[in-house]
Design a protein with these regions (language model features):
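P-loop NTPase motor core of the ASCE superfamily
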Residues: 152-162, 546-604, 608, 768, ...
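Glycine-rich phosphate-binding loop of nucleotide-binding enzymes
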Residues: 441-526
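A short beta-strand-to-loop transition that corresponds to the Sensor-1 phosphate-sensing loop
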Residues: 506, 760-765, 791-793
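Sensor-1/coupling segment of RecA-like P-loop NTPase cores
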Residues: 751-768
């Protein structure tokens, strides 16, 4: 019965109204208990008053930040560099310069390092300009638009996700006398400026450094600053700041970002080279090193105390093994004291704080554990500040907050040791080349540095003192990423409007990529589809003697040079045959001169006349040369007393020319040129010629195509970038083809003068650097300002051990590099280990192209 019910309880009836109320109360109590239980499972956050939590303010009159004791704050930014790739002498120069920072005139300071998103806004705008100037009714322009749009979208996305990152290094100094403070900052600039780009930050840049610390999740900053002091501090204040207890440790919570601060508790007295760089670039971790002059004699006092402790332990030690270890430690410490006294090293105190960030306490703890595990082998042990999380949090902040740092945080060492622990190791590349007054060519994002995760925005047309041409050398064993890297360059450069030529010996992915880019695939093993007439005269336009331009075409007489080209062409074609000697060559050249004479071209005919009056179909072909020699033979045989030796020479020449004029190779070489070079991407497919015995025909056709491309490059009337990819150029690296190798060297030396670059690539480094052609191979590589070394294995790296091409310190990396990793030399002053990062869309396309050929 609803509302009224009875139940037995000690034979007494229960009031149903009271019973109902009791049930409600029990329900409320149960609910409260569950809530309390749930609360216990949640992270408890104690909030701080934001204004009390941040120990500095803003001086509107001076337009500077200052701490609560009235000390003004100034910052000096310095650029990172990869000194690991330097020679020993260069490394020591950087180390010595850095160690000179630690002196009494500069005094106490802080070095702060943090990760920021890569600066890509300018590149995004440049991509937009290129997109806006395309004609989308043109099929090739539509393809270019898609490539540019893909690159632009990727940059926009990674700017938000911080997939592309940079590293910022700053010194922080403070003092009440602004003039003296500026002088101290100028001393840092003067000391480091000769070695790495160093400058004093203005207020806006100083503001951004501090803002990034207190707003670690911010994805963008303001375009305008507030005028009022309170407003500026309001910009800096996070929405909330609190503390989370995690056992005996505490985390600072900053707008849902959890932060834990650690400091170096133990480090080796003889630290690893550039030790601080490993800490200063350890992922998305904020690094802060405080330093200050130590008391006179502090270091020797500390070591004397250590010696006293060792002596005491030696007296207590019972076994010989322990005594022996302590004796070695005693001798080592004593030597350090004597050295410091002799050299007069200045003692300095330093301490290092690290801020670890994460979206949860668990994530922060996992990062901390990884950090502990990573650095224990380097002799570093970290500790957490107990019951002082906010104080240590602010010690990491770029404000030189010293919190009256106690001795337990500071370590005493020498200025030389601090210099040895050099922290500014970071590598990134931001290439930028002027396109028009307000626009630059967007570079190609090729990946990130392996050691520091810096971005690599690469443009081979960047001109600097140490980057004098546009040539690239690419090498790597099969399957290590060389071909995909070439495809990535070709793909992006198509979008940027390069004119690109590809000499393709493999005939696999590159011809499919050319088709994808609406380029022209020319089958150079089938004359009906792609023939280049070797007798079509090539031009070579030299520089004028005055150095003020090129020699005019009406002052160039090209037949003589072209005959020399044909001499090298025929030498390559004959291969190992020794039947053709100098007399036979002379006879063939007389026939060549004759057939050119029939169309009114001789050694006095100018290039301008030929250009104005001759088309492809007007030139002679090899069958004309063959027929001429055959006619001469008939005339000799009709003579009353024919010269038998002369007859034999003619017959040998005919036998030599017959395959190329009427035989198996006539389809390749005997006929007029029928290729169209109007496409922006042209792939000359030579793969079907690889089966030729000794690659004789392959090398000959390679040379023929190369010379034809070279003529097109130097004759190009458009002011545009051009790049020639000579894949597997090792086919011409043979002592038999010395003329071709020398021609290749000429092209790679002179191509820059025509706004063009050459990219020789190979997986057969043994063919390029073998003893018989090593001189030519090294010359080709050294003439490439940009060099990319993918994995070579033990056998491949052996060829570099007797050269200066790869530093000894990098040879092991190149030997064991993973797929897609390379050692990159960018000019003479920049080198880095790079992990190639191809965009997802392009990578999927390339993978399909690779799979389709199987």
């Amino acid at each position: 019965m609803f509302g009224i019910f009875k139940r037995k309880n000690k034979n007494k009836d229960i009031d149903p109204v009271k019973e109902k109320q009791k049930l409600v109360n029990d329900s409320i109590k149960k609910s409260k208990k569950e809530k309390k239980k749930k609360k216990k499972k949640q992270t408890k956050i104690d909030r701080f008053d934001i204004r009390d939590a941040i120990p500095f303010t803003y001086d509107e009159e001076k337009n500077m930040f200052k701490d609560l004791d009235g000390n003004y704050i100034m910052m000096v930014r310095t650029a990172g560099t990869n000194i690991f790739g330097f020679k020993d002498n260069d490394q020591y120069a950087f180390i010595r310069a850095f160690s000179r920072i630690f002196n009494n005139s500069i005094g106490a300071g802080q070095i702060y390092s943090y990760m920021v998103g890569a600066d890509v806004d300018g590149y995004v705008a440049d991509f937009q300009y290129f997109k806006d100037n395309l004609n989308l009714s043109n099929p090739q322009d539509r393809i270019r638009y898609e490539i540019l749009d893909e690159a632009q979208r990727r940059l926009k996305y990674t700017a938000l996700t911080k997939e592309l990152v940079d590293r910022c290094f700053v010194f922080i100094l403070k003092g009440q006398d602004i003039f003296q403070l500026e002088q101290r900052c100028q001393e840092i600039v003067a000391t480091l400026g000769s070695y790495q780009k160093t400058s004093i930050l203005d207020f806006m840049d100083t503001f951004l450094v501090i803002y990034n610390f207190y707003h670690p999740q911010a994805s963008k900053l303001f375009t305008e600053m507030a005028k009022e002091a309170d407003d500026i501090m309001d910009y800096l204040y996070p929405t909330r700041i609190g503390m989370v207890d995690v056992g005996f440790r505490q985390c600072v919570e900053l707008d849902r970002v959890f932060c834990r601060t650690k400091f170096i508790h133990i480090y080796r007295k003889e630290p690893a080279f550039a030790l601080m760089s490993y800490l200063a670039t350890a992922g998305d971790i904020d690094f802060s090193m405080h330093f200050k002059p130590a008391e006179s004699g502090a270091l020797t006092k500390s070591l004397d105390k250590e010696i006293h402790n060792i002596e005491r332990n030696m007296q207590k030690a019972k076994d010989a093994s322990t005594q022996s270890k302590l004796m070695k430690q005693f001798d080592k410490t004593q030597t350090m004291v004597e050295k410091m006294v002799a050299e007069g090293d200045t003692p300095f105190d330093f301490t290092v704080f690290l801020r670890i960030k994460g979206d949860s306490v668990q994530q922060v703890n996992e990062i901390c554990k990884d950090l502990d595990d990573s650095f224990v082998s380097m002799g570093i042990q970290f500790s957490d500040g107990v019951f002082e999380p906010l104080e240590l949090f602010n010690c990491t902040a770029p404000i030189l907050y010293d919190y009256e740092l106690k001795d337990r945080f500071y370590k005493t060492t020498t200025t030389a040791t601090l210099g040895w622990m050099y922290p500014f190791v970071f590598e990134a590349l931001y290439d930028s080349t002027q396109y028009s007054q307000d626009v630059h060519y967007p570079p190609v994002y090729i990946g990130n540095t392996i050691q520091t995760n810096g971005v690599v925005f690469y443009d081979n047309f960047t001109k600097k003192d140490d980057r004098s041409n546009y040539n690239e050398f690419v090498v790597g064993n099969s399957g290590m990423g060389k071909t995909f890297f070439l495809m990535w360059l070709i793909y992006n450069r198509c979008g940027l409007g390069y004119k690109q030529y590809i000499l393709d010996v493999e005939g696999k992915e590159l011809n499919k990529l050319t088709y994808e880019l609406d380029g022209a695939n020319i089958d150079c093993s089938n004359g009906e589809k792609g023939r280049i007439n070797p007798l079509q005269i090539r031009f070579n336009v030299p520089d004028s003697d005055t150095g003020d331009g090129k020699v005019p075409l009406d002052q160039i007489y090209p037949l003589e040079q072209h005959i020399r080209f044909l001499r090298s062409f025929l030498n390559a074609y004959k291969g190992d045959s020794d039947e053709i000697g100098i007399l036979h060559t002379n006879l063939i050249e007389r026939a060549l001169t004759h057939v050119y004479g029939l169309i009114n071209i001789d050694f006095k005919t100018t290039a301008q006349y030929i250009l104005d009056n001759f088309k492809s179909e007007d030139y002679p072909i090899f069958s004309d040369v063959y027929d001429t020699i055959q006619q001469w033979l008939k005339e000799i045989e009709k003579q009353p007393h024919p010269d038998r030796a002369e007859i034999e020479r003619h017959k040998v020449c005919l036998a030599f020319l017959e395959p190329i004029a009427y035989g198996a190779d006539a389809n390749l070489f005997n006929g007029h040129t029928n290729v169209d070079l109007s496409a922006n991407v042209i792939n000359f497919n030579l793969s079907a010629l690889q089966d030729n015995t000794g690659s004789r025909v392959l090398a000959t056709q390679y040379y023929n195509v190369l010379s034809y491309i070279w003529t097109d490059i130097i004759s190009d009337p458009f002011n545009r970038r051009k790049q020639l990819y000579a894949d597997e150029f090792s086919v011409i690296m043979d002592p038999r083809y010395l003329d071709i190798m020398m021609y290749f060297q000429t092209v790679i030396k002179r191509v820059r003068k025509y706004m063009a670059g050459l990219t020789p690539a190979t997986q057969q480094i043994s063919d390029v650097l073998k003893d018989s052609v090593k001189e030519q191979g090294e010359a080709i590589i050294e003439n490439s300002v940009y060099q990319f070394y993918f994995g070579l294995g033990a056998e491949g790296i052996e060829y570099f051990k007797k050269t200066h091409l790869i530093p000894e310190s990098e040879q092991e990396f190149v030997q064991f590099a993973n797929i897609g990793e390379c050692y990159a030399k960018i000019g003479t002053s920049t080198a880095m280990r790079v992990r190639i990062q191809i965009g997802d869309e392009a990578f999927n396309k390339f993978t399909r192209m690779k799979d389709d050929r199987k």
